[in-house]
Amino acid sequence: MNLKLIAFSLALGLATVANAAADKVVGYFPYWSQYAQFAPKDIRFNMVTHIHYVSIAPSSDGSLAFADENDIENFKELSKLAAENNVKLIVSVGGIEQEGTLAEIAASEEVRGTFASNVASFLDENGAAGVELDWQNLTAENAEGFAALVNALKDALGGKTLSIAAYPLTSADAYDGSVLNNAEYVTVLVPDQMTEENSELKPNQSVAVIEEALNALSAKGVDKEKLLPAFSLYGKSFMGAKGFGEAPTGVGSGNEGILTYKELMKKFETPDYKVSFDEASKSEIAVSEMESIVFMGIPSVKALAELVKSEGYAGVAAYDLSQDHTEPIVSLLVTIGLELRPDVDYKAKKK
C-alpha cells in the first residue's frame, strides 16, 4: 500500500458511537456478481447486517423466477452463509424493466394476492428474512396500485421484513409517506447523475444529491428512521475534462467508462491521477492528463455515514458488494462500519 493511499485514507478519523437508529449496513449482491468472479464465499459478512439479493423477477400472473437461472446455486449458498453469519437475507423483487409487470400485478386484486403469497412462500422455502419491493420508474398514475401491492405484501409476510426501494429524484410525485411507512425501511437510490449527455462534468453521485433525495422523501412524510440511503461503489470516467464544469469529449477508461472502486484504488497507486475531495458536493474527482473520474471515496462515504448517524436515518446501503476493496484501510464498507458499527473487528483476516 503506497503513502498516497494511506494519506487519502486518513479522512477516516476516529469513529464514534452511532445513534440507535443508524444500525443497518446493507450490501447488495446482484446476480451478475457471478460474472465478476465474486461468489457468496467472498462476502465479508461481518461488514453488513443485511444482504439484498438482486433479483427475483415477477410474471404478470404473480409467479416468480430467478432473473438469471444460472445463479440459483449461488443463491442457495448465499442463503446458507447468511444464516451461518447471522446476516439477514432480503430478496429484491422487481428491478430493471419490471415496472410494467408490477403494474399488471397491482391492477388485479386476485393477482396481487397470488403474488404476495408466492413471495411469502419463496422467503420461507429459501430461508430469507424478507423482501425488497423494487418498482422502478413509478408514476403518479400507478401510485394507487403501488399502495395496494405494498399492503398485500405486508399482509402476507407476517413477521418477515418488508423493504421498499425508492427513487425520489425520478418518482417523487408517485410516493405517499403513509405507504412507504408500511416498510421496515426504505432504501433510497439515486440514479447516475453524470452521463454522456451532460455537456459539463459534474459528480455522478455525492452526499449532496443523496441528501436531496432523503429530504424529498422526508417532505412526503416518510419517517426519517426508516430511510436508508444507498451509494454506488463505482466511478465514471470521461475523456478531456480536467475538472468539474469542463466539457468532456467522450467516455474514458474502464468498461464503457465505468470503474469499480477496487479498480480505482489500483489506478491511484500510480502518480498519474490527482485525487481531491469536493467539499461542495461531498464527492471525489480524480484528474489525469487524459481523463477525469468522478466517484465516491472514503471522505464522501464517511460524510454520508456521519449524516446518517447525526440525522437518525436507518443506515447505509452499498451497491454492490463485489466492487469494494478488501484492504480495511481503503474499504468503503469499513468506512461505514467505523461510523455506524464501531464495535465490529474490521482487521483483515490472516490467511
Regions found by a protein language model. Name each.
Residues 52-55, 122-139, 189, 315-320:
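Short acidic catalytic loops
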Residues 72-79, 116-123, 147-154, 210-215, ...:
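Generic structural signal for well-ordered alpha-helices
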Residues 21-121, 202-203, 331, 346:
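Glycan-recognition patch characteristic of GH18 chitinases/ENGases
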Residues 1-19:
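Gram-negative bacterial Sec-dependent N-terminal signal peptides
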Residues 26, 30, 62-70, 137-267:
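Substrate-binding surface in catalytic domains of secreted glycosidases
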Residues 51, 91, 133, 186, ...:
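Conserved, mostly hydrophobic/aromatic
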Residues 233-307, 333-350:
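Glycan-binding loop/region signatures in secreted carbohydrate-active enzymes
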Residues 23, 49, 85-89, 127-129, ...:
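Short, well-ordered coil/turn segments that N-cap beta-strands
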